[in-house]
C-alpha cells in the first residue's frame, strides 16, 4: 500500500560531497496492487547522461534506465544543523509498522513490554478478529486465473465470473492475506478500503467494484480488470515525459476522479503514477484510480495527522502531521511535473533527504525542457505545488484552470465553497465588508470558476438559499459522504435559511484570500480592493476592536497600531491586507449574519 519505508544505508551521508563512482540504477519494480503492467522494453531516451550511482532509494524513478536526473532539478542544498537533524522518515516508517503490525528495528537494551511492542492493537496475547462478515462462496462464483500483480498485503489475479450479473466477464481479484493483518490498524484499513471502493465505484475514472468475499485465509476483492498497464509504464514508454497536449488529457482524468472523491470527504493519501491504470492498451484508453488502502475520511472540521504515503509524492503538511484533501493536490502537482518534464521535483538519496527537499527546496522551472513548455502550463503546476496548502487550487478549481479549459473537463461541485460560505456567514459585519470589497477586484479567470459554482447550486430568483446548498450536496452524495459527515456543515449554515445570497455576495463569501495571495497580480488585486473598501465599507476601528476581530490578545496591540491611520482611525492599506489574511473568522458560536 504505502511505500515510505527505507533501507539501512550507513555508507552514504546526505550532506557529503558526491564521489564520482558509478553503479547500475535499480530496475523498476512491478509491485502493482491491482493489475499487471506492460513488460515490454523501454526505449532509451535521447537525453541520457552518466548513470547516477546514488539512486539507492527503494522508490522507483520515473525516468528510463540510464537517465540520470539532473542535480539542478532539486538543488543540492546543504542543510546545516547544530545537532544531527531528526529523520523525517521515522514517523512514516513508524506509522506503516503500526499498520502492518511489524516490530520496530532491533535496539539495544531490554526487550520492550507487550504494551510497547504491540502497536495499535494486536499485541502479544491479544487475539485479533479477522472475520469481516463478507460472503464465503468465492470459488463458487469465480474461476481464478494467473497472477497479474503483487503488493505488500497480497496479490492480484485474473479471474472469470461463473454466475451472476457479470457471468462470463473477466475481472481482477485482489487477494489480501489475513496472515499479514497483524494489527488492528491493518484490519481497519482493509475494512475501510472495501467500504470506499463500494461507495466510489460509480465514477467513470474510479475502478469498478463488483463484490467482496472472504475465507479463513484471505479477503477477495473483485474489481474491474484494467489491462492497459500503469500510468508509470506509459510515461517510461514515452521516454520519460508526455507532450503537453497528452499530459492535459491525463491530468483531466486524474483531477476528475480526485474532485469526485474529495467531494465525498475522502482523501486518497497515495496518489502516484503506479496507482493509475489504463482500461486498455488503446491510445484513447480511460485512466482509472486504484488502491484506496491508505485512504481515509477527511471531515470538514478536522485535520488528519498520521503520516502515510509515498516519499516522492508526500505533501509538506503530511510531514507536519496536519493535513486534509489538499495533500492529494500536492501529489497531483508532482505527477504533473513528472509528466511535463520527465524529472521529479524533489529528489534525495534517502527518504530523509527527499523529505527535507519537500519541506525546504523549490521545484526547478528553468532547466530543459521547461523553457519550451507554455507559461500557462507552468502556472498550473506551480499552483498545485505551493507549500502552503491554503494557497493550492482544489481539484475542481484545477479543472477550471485555463490550461485545461480546451479539454472540456466539465465541473464538479467544490466543497471548499461550503467551508468558505460557512465562515463568511459566521464572520463579523466588518469582516464581511472587507471581503465584499475584495470580491470586486477578483480577476476574470477566478470569476469564471465562481460563476460556474454558483450555477451548479441552481439559484432561484438570482440568489441562493440554504436549501440550494442542501439539494446540491444531496445530488452528489454517496455512502462515503455520509461516513465523512460532510453534510454536518449544513447545520452551521442555518442563517442562510432566512437570507438570500446574490451572485455578488456569493463571490464575497466564496473567495479564498490565500489563493488570491498566490497569484502574481495579488498586489494589484489588494490595491483595487482597498480602494473599494475605502469608499464603501471602511469605518473607524479601535485597536482593541481590531484585536477582537482577529482573535488576538493585548500583546498584539503595539503591532495593530501600525495598521490603523492616526488621522481618521481607519485601516490603512497594510492593515487591510493583513486583516484579510489574518485569523478573522469567529468561532461557530459567534453571531450569525444579520
UniProtKB/Swiss-Prot annotation:
Ca(2+) 3 binds at residues 538, 545. Residues 34-49 have a biased composition (Low complexity). Autophosphorylated. Ca(2+) 1 binds at residue 461. Its main location: membrane. It is found in: Membrane. Residues 427-447 are annotated as: Calmodulin binding (CaMBD). The active site is at residue 270. PROSITE patterns: PROTEIN_KINASE_ATP (PS00107), PROTEIN_KINASE_DOM (PS50011), PROTEIN_KINASE_ST (PS00108). Keywords: ATP-binding, Calcium, Kinase, Lipoprotein, Membrane, Metal-binding, Myristate, Nucleotide-binding, Phosphoprotein, Repeat, Serine/threonine-protein kinase, Transferase. Ca(2+) 4 binds at residues 566, 568, 570. Residues 408-438 are annotated as: Autoinhibitory domain. Residues 445-480, 481-516, 517-556, 557-586 form the EF-hand domain. InterPro entries: CDPK_Ser/Thr_kinases, EF-hand-dom_pair, Kinase-like_dom_sf, Prot_kinase_dom, Protein_kinase_ATP_BS, Ser/Thr_kinase_AS. SMART domains: S_TKc (SM00220). Its EC number is 2.7.11.1. PANTHER family: SERINE/THREONINE-PROTEIN KINASE. There are 3 contiguous domains conserved in the CDPK subfamily: a kinase domain, an autoinhibitory (junction) domain and a calmodulin-like domain. The autoinhibitory domain (408-438) inactivates kinase activity under calcium-free conditions. May play a role in signal transduction pathways that involve calcium as a second messenger. Belongs to the protein kinase superfamily. Ser/Thr protein kinase family. CDPK subfamily. This is CDPK-related kinase 6. It comes from Arabidopsis thaliana.
Amino acid at each position: 500500500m504505502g511505500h515510505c519505508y527505507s533501507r539501512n544505508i550507513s555508507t552514504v551521508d546526505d550532506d557529503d560531497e558526491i564521489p564520482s563512482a558509478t553503479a547500475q540504477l535499480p530496475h523498476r519494480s512491478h509491485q502493482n496492487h491491482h493489475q499487471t503492467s506492460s513488460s515490454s522494453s523501454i526505449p532509451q531516451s535521447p537525453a541520457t547522461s552518466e548513470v547516477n550511482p546514488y539512486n539507492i532509494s527503494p522508490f522507483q524513478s520515473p525516468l528510463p534506465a540510464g537517465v540520470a536526473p539532473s542535480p539542478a532539478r532539486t538543488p543540492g542544498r546543504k542543510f546545516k544543523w547544530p545537532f544531527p537533524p531528526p529523520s523525517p522518515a521515522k514517523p512514516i516508517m513508524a506509522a506503516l509498522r503500526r499498520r502492518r503490525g511489524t516490530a520496530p528495528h532491533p535496539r539495544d537494551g531490554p526487550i520492550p513490554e507487550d504494551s510497547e511492542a504491540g502497536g495499535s492493537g494486536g499485541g502479544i496475547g491479544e487475539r485479533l478478529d479477522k472475520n469481516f462478515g463478507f460472503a464465503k462462496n468465492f470459488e463458487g462464483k469465480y474461476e481464478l486465473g494467473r497472477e497479474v500483480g503483487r503488493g505488500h498485503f497480497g496479490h492480484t489475479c485474473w479471474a472469470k465470473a461463473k454466475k451472476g450479473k457479470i457471468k462470463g466477464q473477466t475481472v481482477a481479484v485482489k487477494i489480501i492475506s489475513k496472515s499479514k493483518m497483524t494489527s488492528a490498524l491493518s484490519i481497519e484499513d482493509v475494512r475501510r478500503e472495501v467500504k470506499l471502493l463500494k461507495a466510489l465505484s460509480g465514477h467513470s475514472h474510479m475502478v469498478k467494484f463488483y463484490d467482496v468475499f472472504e475465507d479463513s485465509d484471505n479477503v477477495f476483492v473483485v474489481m474491474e480488470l484494467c489491462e492497459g498497464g500503469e500510468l508509470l509504464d506509459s510515461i517510461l514508454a514515452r521516454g520519460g515525459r508526455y507532450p503537453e497536449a497528452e499530459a492535459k488529457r491525463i491530468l483531466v482524468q486524474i483531477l476528475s476522479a480526485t474532485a469526485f472523491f474529495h467531494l465525498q470527504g475522502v482523501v486518497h493519501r497515495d496518489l502516484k503514477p503506479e496507482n493509475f491504470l489504463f482500461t486498455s492498451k488503446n491510445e484513447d484508453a480511460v485512466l482509472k484510480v486504484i488502491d484506496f488502502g491508505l485512504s481515509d475520511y477527511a471531515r470538514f472540521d478536522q485535520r488528519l495527522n498520521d503520516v502515510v504515503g509515498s516519499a516522492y509524492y508526500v505533501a509538506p503538511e503530511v510531514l507536519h502531521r496536519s493535513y486534509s484533501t489538499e495533500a492529494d493536490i500536492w501529489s497531483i502537482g508532482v505527477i504533473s511535473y513528472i509528466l511535463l518534464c520527465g524529472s521529479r521535483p524533489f529528489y534525495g538519496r534517502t527518504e530523509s533527504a527527499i523529505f527535507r527537499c519537500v519541506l525546504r527546496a523549490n521545484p526547478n522551472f528553468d532547466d530543459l525542457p521547461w523553457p519550451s513548455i507554455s507559461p500557462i502550463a507552468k502556472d498550473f503546476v506551480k499552483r498545485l505545488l505551493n507549500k502552503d496548502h491554503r494557497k493550492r487550487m482544489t481539484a475542481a478549481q484545477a479543472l477550471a484552470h485555463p490550461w485545461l479549459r480546451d479539454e472540456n473537463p466539465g465541473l464538479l461541485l467544490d466543497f471548499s465553497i461550503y467551508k468558505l460560505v460557512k465562515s463568511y456567514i459566521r464572520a463579523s459585519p466588518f469582516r464581511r465588508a472587507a471581503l465584499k470589497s475584495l470580491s470586486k477586484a477578483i480577476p476574470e479567470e477566478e470569476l469564471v470558476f465562481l460563476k460556474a459554482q454558483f450555477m451548479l447550486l441552481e439559484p432561484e430568483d438570482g440568489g441562493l438559499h440554504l436549501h440550494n446548498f442542501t439539494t446540491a450536496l444531496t445530488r452528489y452524495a454517496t455512502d462515503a459522504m455520509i461516513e465523512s459527515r460532510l453534510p454536518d456543515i449544513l447545520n452551521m449554515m442555518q442563517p442562510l435559511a432566512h437570507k438570500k445570497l446574490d451572485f455578488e455576495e456569493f463571490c464575497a463569501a466564496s473567495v479564498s484570500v490565500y489563493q488570491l495571495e498566490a497569484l502574481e497580480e495579488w498586489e494589484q488585486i489588494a490595491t483595487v480592493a482597498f480602494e473599494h473598501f475605502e469608499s464603501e465599507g471602511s469605518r473607524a476601528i479601535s485597536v482593541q476592536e481590531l484585536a477582537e476581530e482577529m482573535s488576538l490578545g493585548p500583546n498584539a496591540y503595539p503591532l495593530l497600531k501600525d495598521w490603523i491611520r492616526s488621522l481618521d482611525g481607519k485601516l490603512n492599506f497594510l492593515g487591510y491586507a493583513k486583516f484579510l489574511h489574518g485569523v478573522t473568522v469567529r468561532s461557530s458560536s459567534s453571531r450569525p449574519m444579520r
